[in-house]
Regions:
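Bacterial C-terminal helix-turn-helix
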Residues: 2-7, 14-79
Length: 79
């Protein structure tokens, strides 16, 4: 099953709509950081698995430099 950009967008949108609904009248805060941190970890997990743990290859797949990748892996407890 190939996941399209649109289906990823739909998942994020629906998840946020549910999150806002669950909050009720409470005003959400730091939504951007919450979403980025939540989405980043599985991206790095999947890409590192695809690259068989090779950080240089994973960085190339992601289009980021290896130092940035290492920083993000550490941030998410993946190193």
């Amino acid at each position: 099953h190939v996941m399209s950009k649109e289906s990823i967008e739909d998942v994020v949108r629906k998840s946020l709509e549910k999150y806002f609904k669950d909050l009720g009248e409470q005003l959400p805060s730091n939504v951007y950081d919450m979403v980025v941190l939540t989405v980043e970890k599985p991206i790095f997990e999947a890409v590192m698995a695809r690259a068989d743990g090779n950080q240089s290859q994973a960085a190339e797949i992601l289009g980021i430099n290896r130092n940035t990748l290492r920083k993000k892996l550490q941030q998410h407890g993946l190193l």
